[in-house]
Amino acid sequence: MKTLLLTLVVVTMVCMDLGYTTICYNHLSRTPETTEICPDSWYFCYKISLADGNDVRIKRGCTFTCPELRPTGKYVYCCRRDKCNQ
């Protein structure tokens, strides 16, 4: 009986996780905060600081894998919780 109950708990936890989607901020640095629901299997939120001359812009969104820092970037922040890229 304990084995059956444990099996049901494990199956329930696995099934509940299958439908989970991540929510990330997707606004640029000077625009109002907006969010997006990430596509299936896109579990990461990112925040990139981009240098554009003397101006620094921040870009946010969902991603499948964490982006790499490009020559024009200052930093990349990648996380895996809802709205963690503020």
Swiss-Prot record:
Tissue expression remark: Expressed by the venom gland.
GO cellular component entries: extracellular region
Domain of life assignment: Eukaryota
Region forming the signal peptide: 1-21
Keywords: Disulfide bond, G-protein coupled acetylcholine receptor impairing toxin, G-protein coupled receptor impairing toxin, Neurotoxin, Postsynaptic neurotoxin, Secreted, Signal, Toxin
Family indicated by similarity: Belongs to the three-finger toxin family. Short-chain subfamily. Orphan group VIII (haditoxin) sub-subfamily.
Function: Antagonist of muscle and neuronal nicotinic acetylcholine receptors (nAChR) with highest affinity for neuronal alpha-7/CHRNA7 nAChRs.
Protein name: Neurotoxin homolog NL1
Organism expressing this protein natively: Naja atra (Chinese cobra)
